[in-house]
Amino acid sequence: MEIIMFIAYAVVGTLLALALAASATLTLQGNDQVVANMRKVEVPDSWLPRLAALKAAGAVGLVAGLWAAPLGVAAAIGVTLYFVGAVISHLRVKDFDLAPAAVLALIAVAALALRTAA
């Protein structure tokens, strides 16, 4: 059963890492849509490089978690907290276009559960 959980983590974790890496890249490039979404929830532009770094670190940690379980668990916890914070940021300004952040938070929780079970 552990091997099935590991394979499931490998798929979910890798796909989540790819999404995080793409998002980090777009954030660092100052993509208009990303910047507009961040401004909509009142995130200062000066925070964008730090938030991109957090997403990139999460991506690296999820992939490293394929070889070192504690890194995968830590990364999944961090990514979950990041996207829970994103959901809270949307709710704080009464912006209910929060499905992407909520879905990514749930995927991060799934990665955490799978890596813990593997």
Which residues does each PLM region occupy?
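Membrane-interface extramembranous regions
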Residues: E2-A118
